[in-house]
């Protein structure tokens, strides 16, 4: 993968087609899966490469699927072994009300930061990125080549202050922050991609992290099928259509450059201060 530079010096990838060589480009990028009893799509986002030859820090940012079913052993691992102090929950208020309190909610010293990135209407759950028909039409309008990418852009357009709030919560977490939604794919994937880009992780590694969720698709969907809240969304489409596509995240990152001048520009234009941006970058970098 080669990069080209625009006049403003911000990185831009050379096109979605370049991600066909993703596995070769990202040789040596190892996903740090965390095995838990009550969640199946959890990983530490440390040790990812940065553009200046450094790495992201371990035990600073985790991504996950729904944390509702954690066992006592899971809680000990996350809080005592890894040092989680902040849960960044991207689910809707409807989801929170339907699911009830989660095990980490009862742990002293763990802050729950609620940042729903979907409009708070109806029963939006977002297990399947384009499952909601009204939003599906808007998603196709936003980015006809890939409606799921259009759906991701919708988070930025519909709920920018919640997206920014999620990044701010990560930046100022005293210990590790774990970001999650239901499947840990769409909402989580976008917020994590923004955070990693700020930290200087190159686009191909951001895409590799996003696509890694595909390794756990069957387990994620099996888990969600057991939930009354999510089963209808999950059963509405075959598993292959619920897998993350590398091309979708590649397109999203390209659109961030093309439409907004880059991730950092969009964040600062929507209320993330320069101090917050620096805090996020420092927080996620090894050696900080």
Question: Where do the PLM segments sit?
Answer:
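Ser/Thr-glycine-rich phosphate-binding loops at phosphate-binding pockets of nucleotides
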Residues: 183, 187-188
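Cys-dependent protein tyrosine phosphatase-like superfamily
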Residues: 2-6, 10, 19-178, 190-288
């Amino acid at each position: 993968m080669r990069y080209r530079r625009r006049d403003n010096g911000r990185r831009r990838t050379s096109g979605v087609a370049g991600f066909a060589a993703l596995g070769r480009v990202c040789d040596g990028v190892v996903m740090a899966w965390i095995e838990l009893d009550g969640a199946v799509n959890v990983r530490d986002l440390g040790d990812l490469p940065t553009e200046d030859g450094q790495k992201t820090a371990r035990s600073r940012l985790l991504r996950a699927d729904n944390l509702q079913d954690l066992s006592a052993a899971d809680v000990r691992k996350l809080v005592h072994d890894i040092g989680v102090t902040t849960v960044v929950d991207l689910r809707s208020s409807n989801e929170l009300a339907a699911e009830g309190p989660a095990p980490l909610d009862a742990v002293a010293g763990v802050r729950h930061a609620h940042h729903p990135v979907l409009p708070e209407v109806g029963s939006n759950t977002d297990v399947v990125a384009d499952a909601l028909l009204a939003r599906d039409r808007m998603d196709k309008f936003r980015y006809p080549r890939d409606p799921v990418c259009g759906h991701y852009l919708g988070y930025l357009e519909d709920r920018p202050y919640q997206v920014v709030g999620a990044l701010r919560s990560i930046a100022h977490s005293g210990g590790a922050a774990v970001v999650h939604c239901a499947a840990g794919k769409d909402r989580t994937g976008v917020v994590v991609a923004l955070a990693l880009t700020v930290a200087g992780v190159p686009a191909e590694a951001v895409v590799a992290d996003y696509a890694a969720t595909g390794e756990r698709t069957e387990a994620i969907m099996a888990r969600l099928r057991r939930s009354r809240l999510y089963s209808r969304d999950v059963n509405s489409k075959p598993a292959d259509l619920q897998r993350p596509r590398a091309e979708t995240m590649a397109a999203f990152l390209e659109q961030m450059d093309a439409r907004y001048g880059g991730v950092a520009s969009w964040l600062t234009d929507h209320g993330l201060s320069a101090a917050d941006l620096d805090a996020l970058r420092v927080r996620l970098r090894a050696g900080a």
